[in-house]
Amino acid sequence: MDVQYVLADLQTGPESQSSQSSIHFHDMAPFYVVSIERQHGLSGLVSIVPCSTTPTIHYDEKDKKAYQKAWSRGRRFAALFENLLNGGKMATKTSCSLQQTPYLQLRDEALIVGSPLGTPTRTREGISSFHNMEFNFPGAKPVVSSQMLHITCPGLRSEESLFDKNGGALYDSVTVLTGMCLFTRKILDESVADGFLDTRKLLDMQLTLYEVERIAGLSSAIADIAALVLSRYDGKCHKPVNIILDLPTWHYYQSVEDQLQHRGYKPCEVMDWIEAITLRSQQLAGLLKSAVLHELDRRGVSSSQRLYDIQISPGSALVDDAFRETLKYENLPCLDNILEALSGSEDGSWQQFYSLLPERDRPQSIKDLSYLFYIFEVVRPAVLAGIQSGNQQTPTQSADMDSTVSHRQQQPASSRSYTSKQNQMPRPLVISVDDPSERKLYSKAHSFFLRLPKNPIYPADPTLVQVYTTRRVFVDGNRKGERLYRNDPSPVMPELSNGKLYGDGGDAGYSKYARELQQMDFIAKLYGAECAANIQRWSKEVGLC
């Protein structure tokens, strides 16, 4: 699923020139042509073009400083990420090439994306730069995968890598996690909009454009990062590498919670509706897992080697069971019952997480809990690391540790240490891979990470690296910064736009497709025909075709 620099523009407004939406494709590669709005029609999107040794930034004059700042900050964090995954400065591109070792190279090309000034999206998300990060996997069947990524890692120091100055593993465990939504916002709303819960709309729904695009984009990025981490540890040490796929189930209950009392939905109806959502979640999780396994195998990491573990929404099972148990007895779920069920988690992660929440951040409704739970899934690996280390502190040790932590956080990770191994806090590394629209969630998770070293019971010193994939699909020229999830026309497919099929860098064979775009045509255009064929095959295996 190597990234081709093809972007899509979904036209839902008057410019579509019909009641049906249409779609344009724009080839941004190989970046040697200045890509500015008058050429591709996407507001707020600019490119950085390699020009001798200094990249040239093509920007909107009104946003000159903002775009330059976004590029500079993004480039700096991308370089830190490159150093982290390459195992430090000792692992240069040249040495890795000579040894046939996988490596990451930060290239010059970049996309800077920002919605127009004055739009809610611009206020919420600002401007981000996505840098071309080239993952190289030599071998009998070499793979070179280019990802346009935005990195945020405020807790990462310039000298930090996977190893300390003595060559020992710096982190006790590595977790790569991601998540995605189900269906589209429109489909979920329509399933509850006609005075009854229309479960059939959910059960009979084909894959949406949003779903297939997320699976294609996330799986290759996850595999690139996980495979590179595994290659660094190979032969040196064995450290747990976990991949977590977090997909919602009960979280969507808040979509109907406010309407239950007004419309008189029966608990059995609600249960059927949630079961339909759970089925979709399981199917998509299976599809995403198959895609990740395939991409890891392409990069030389076979599942038979048992070097990693893939988990699906590991913290949600207790809540799913609590919902089923309540609805089975014709009752509606309530927050107190769910919190009580969570308090019985065997690994203790929820109890520790909840105990560190300030009173103002504790949920007051199931809707609050559903959002908080996404944050919990990000924080959970770090909380578990503290619990599993078994280094429970006495109150006196905790007080002494506060001053030690304050000093440690000013030091590079390579020099961080305690006077004795026994008192050393566990250091889990968590790498999230997600859409930029979820940035607020990970910012809240990061603020929680900062509290864990001072946890009076099970302290940990975690690092969170946030990796965001670039948007591949824009809506209405990005004039309002809207997202595909809220504007996906599925199950009605958009029309291919006239005059945009050829001469835009697309495949010559694309003319064989029908005028109405299908999901796999859409993926073939963005990610390649092989990727589309694989997703179609895996979809059948999980019952989605």
Curated annotation (Swiss-Prot):
<protein>
    <recommendedName>
        <fullName>Arginine-containing cyclodipeptide synthase ateA</fullName>
        <ecNumber>6.3.2.-</ecNumber>
    </recommendedName>
</protein>
<keyword id="KW-0436">Ligase</keyword>
<dbReference type="GO" id="GO:0016874">
    <property type="term" value="F:ligase activity"/>
</dbReference>
<comment type="function">
    <text>Arginine-containing cyclodipeptide synthase; part of the cluster that mediates the biosynthesis of a highly modified cyclo-arginine-glutamate dipeptide (cRE). Within the pathway, ateA acts as the scaffold-generating enzyme and is responsible for formation of the cyclo-Arg-Glu diketopiperazine (cRW) from L-arginyl-tRNA(Arg) + L-glutamyl-tRNA(Glu). Additional enzymes from the cluster then further modify the cyclo-Arg-Glu diketopiperazine (cRW) scaffold.</text>
</comment>
<feature type="short sequence motif" description="Conserved DDXXE motif">
    <location>
        <begin position="434"/>
        <end position="438"/>
    </location>
</feature>
<comment type="similarity">
    <text>Belongs to the arginine-containing cyclodipeptide synthase family.</text>
</comment>
<comment type="pathway">
    <text>Secondary metabolite biosynthesis.</text>
</comment>
<feature type="compositionally biased region" description="Polar residues">
    <location>
        <begin position="390"/>
        <end position="425"/>
    </location>
</feature>
<feature type="region of interest" description="Disordered">
    <location>
        <begin position="390"/>
        <end position="433"/>
    </location>
</feature>
